[in-house]
Amino acid sequence: MLLPENMVRLQIISDKSAIDPIITKLLKLGMFQPEDPLYPLGNERIEDARRLITAVQDHVSKLKIIMELGGLVIEPLGSIKVSSWIKAAQDVSEEASKLEERYKELLEEIGRLRSEKDLYQQQLKELEPIKSITVELSKLYSLELFDVILAQVDEDKLRLINQIIGDSNFVYYTRFGEERYIVLIIAEKNINVDKKLREAGVRRYELQEGKSPFQLYNEILERINQINIILERTREELAKKVKTEENYIKNVYGKLLTVRDALNIMNKARVSEYYLQIEGYFPEKHVKKVQNEINNLAFMDYIRPRRYGEKEEPPTLVELPKSIKVLESLVEIYGSPSYWEISPIVFLVFTFPILFGLMFPDFGNALVLLLFSIWFYRYGKKRGSENIPKLSIILIYSSIVAIITGLLARDFFGPLPVGGLREILNNGNYSAGPLYNLWPIPASVSEAIKFLLPFGEYSTSVSIENTMIFSVLLGALALFVSSLLGVIDAIRKKDPEFLFLEKLPLFLLYVVPIFIFMYGITDPANFFTVDQQILGQILNAVLMKSFSENIVGYGIVWWTSFALLYNWAAHAILVKRHDNATWGSAIAMGFIEGGFEGALLLLSNTISFIRVLVFALSHYYILYAFSYMAYLVAPSTTTIGVLINPIAIIILIIGNLLAIGLEGLVVFIQDLRLHFYEMFSKFYEGRGRKFEPVMAYVSLE
């Protein structure tokens, strides 16, 4: 689960006549990725497969469009009986053509309407800046005393216009879009400005005769609305027709996917006069299974690829439980893991929801996010989307952790429903919220962790400092583990240069923050005080104060200096070896990349995790501010009175929608940033290729 599966390169040699049963066996196994043979027994390919695979893929795309427009879940169903895969591909392709023919008119109508709509929308976009002009442009351009020109230009043309027009004439412009301007030019008739501007490449707006921009804009808008109505009616007609043969369409779709994969094997195979050669990758632990399946049909052999130095890197297969496999979609944003890399998914399954929950600690907001995620998951499934359900499950995991942190923080759509005006005004004479005594987490728990609560009724004068240290401690731990994984990856790669000149210097650097912020373990009862003392010792060591009183501080400074010098030297050697630089420039570049940049990254990456505290604070105080505004507009001095006031309710709803929508999105993005930039960059390159086996999408009879 943590490491990619060991792969072998499988070679199958058989009589040409055995091709169909061999392909059937490989499809049923669903664990074989075909490749072009390394040492082909001949140059001859199976031409029928090469010719058919393009047509089959085209049918797959068309059926997906039909299913999507018809509102069907895009999934394969049914079975297929095969004696010859070439014959099966021809038959299924013909069947798909007949199916598509039944929807041809509706699809063409939808396509025509979409094209027409796109054309009108482009015209609207061009008219948008001048849509408020109610005068015909032809009348504007034919004044007796002045030349009037209205044009759309870029920044370079705008400067050119100012040079041509000079100071004696009038130029007015306003910006719209990126580096685009609408320009109104009024000039005297005798200077022939229109001709000069045409020569400079400036073209004035020309519209249909007899209509102002205002009239034309509204006519086009009305036409688009009419097209939308017709388009919706046509889609409904298509959806109704598709529903009547849903299972048949899904069966044809499944058969197309299956013959496509069969043709993919055949397309990469090589044949001679008598023999067939098939090669590809297969998980090593399942080799015996494939041997048992095709032992009586063909001769099979395999080799184990080296992890480093091969011309072709094997595909990567990381077998994960279904419950966490969805996180693969997040990792793939960064890139697929290489064959020798530790998968970051297992790392991500814990850290991503935890960091999200710490930055979004509100039970009510998290509950809304959970319900939205469940709806979004069902919506994605209905649309047949691959990414929406995966993203939804990630949000579900994250919102569950946010519910837990919200319970501990005693926040439910802000501080008002639980802490009440007592918390908002920090005054014990006011009432608590209606949920105060009903809260599932007793107040004693919040009292016990008050040293880590940076806000709310139970926070203390030092809790902000403690939470800051705790946030950086999380970062130090994450960076240490990330750099350690980088060393392990380098060892697995069996590349000494990669290990000793890239990953080991990085690991030695990121030992420093974990040592500093974990030093408090030496005295757990005074953990945060000890950490603050160590930070003080480091400052004293930098300022060259007494050695005997700051031994640990001096040790940390010396270790950091050694690690930075090592990183400097390592980068200098890499620049010298790979960029053919002189020693002088190599040392200079090594200092910039390894010494100076290394020190900056050590500091910035570690401190970057303070954003965990910052976003938790911002979430709380956004809702605190709206709760206070609700208190100000309500005439009541009791919490219940505020919560039932209509204007106060509207203010609280607006504040919570802002927190859920904007803050939730920002926290999700920042969580991704902490993983991709601060953590993954220490050990994960993501330059591999994903294992994509061929398989049977329907039952093979």
Curated annotation (Swiss-Prot):
GO terms for cellular component: plasma membrane; proton-transporting V-type ATPase, V0 domain; vacuolar proton-transporting V-type ATPase complex. It is found in: Cell membrane. The keyword ATP-binding does not apply. The chain crosses the membrane at residues 340-360, 363-379, 388-408, 435-455, 468-488, 498-518, 555-575, 583-603, 612-632, 649-669. Has multiple subunits with at least A(3), B(3), C, D, E, F, H, I and proteolipid K(x). It holds the Pfam family V_ATPase_I. InterPro entries: V-ATPase_116kDa_su. Belongs to the V-ATPase 116 kDa subunit family. NCBIfam families: PRK05771.3-4. Keywords: Cell membrane, Hydrogen ion transport, Ion transport, Membrane, Transmembrane, Transmembrane helix, Transport. It is a multi-pass membrane protein. Component of the A-type ATP synthase that produces ATP from ADP in the presence of a proton gradient across the membrane. This is A-type ATP synthase subunit I. PANTHER family: V-TYPE PROTON ATPASE SUBUNIT A, VACUOLAR PROTON ATPASES. Gene3D superfamilies: 1.20.1460.20, 3.30.70.2170, 3.30.70.2750. GO terms for molecular function: ATPase binding; proton-transporting ATPase activity, rotational mechanism. GO terms for biological process: vacuolar acidification. The lineage of its organism: Archaea, Thermoproteota, Thermoprotei, Sulfolobales, Sulfolobaceae. It comes from the Archaea. Its main location: membrane. It comes from Saccharolobus solfataricus (strain ATCC 35092 / DSM 1617 / JCM 11322 / P2) (Sulfolobus solfataricus).
